[in-house]
């Protein structure tokens, strides 16, 4: 945010958006599902969204609940990712959005 302000963009022109989707990849090595795992390309589309490489938040949650995906949280990047069945998906959830909003509004020059 500070960089945009330094570039001359007034705070009143900056808005914060919330993404309720994830970007998904088919991984090359299913036994290695951490951040940075090699990807072969976009994962097949979700059951409802049907767009390769794109999962709706509800599809990610359903996959986690059904045990098809396992959620992990990257404390450095402050974002979750989920993996399973040769798929790796990065997304935002309540925890990551809470941390990002808190950071945006409590830094030295908050919005």
State each model region's role.
Residues 1-5, 14, 94-98:
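A Trp-anchored, charged/polar loop motif used as the substrate-binding/catalytic surface
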Residues 20-103:
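Glycan-binding loop/region signatures in secreted carbohydrate-active enzymes
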Residues 9-15, 107-111:
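Loop/turn elements at helix/coil->beta-strand transitions in domains of secreted/extracellular proteins
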Residues 5-8, 102-106:
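A general structural signal for short secondary-structure junctions and capping/turn motifs
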């Amino acid at each position: 945010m500070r960089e945009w302000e330094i570039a001359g963009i007034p705070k009143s022109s900056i808005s914060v958006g919330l993404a309720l989707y994830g970007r998904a990849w088919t991984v090359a090595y299913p036994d290695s599902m951490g951040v940075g795992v090699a990807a072969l390309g976009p994962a097949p589309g979700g059951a409802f969204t049907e767009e390769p490489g794109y999962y709706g938040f509800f599809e990610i949650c359903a996959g986690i609940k059904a045990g098809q995906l396992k959620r992990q949280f990257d404390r450095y990047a402050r974002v979750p990712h989920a993996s399973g069945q040769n798929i790796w998906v990065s997304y935002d959830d309540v925890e990551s959005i809470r941390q990002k909003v808190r950071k945006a509004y409590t830094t030295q020059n908050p919005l």
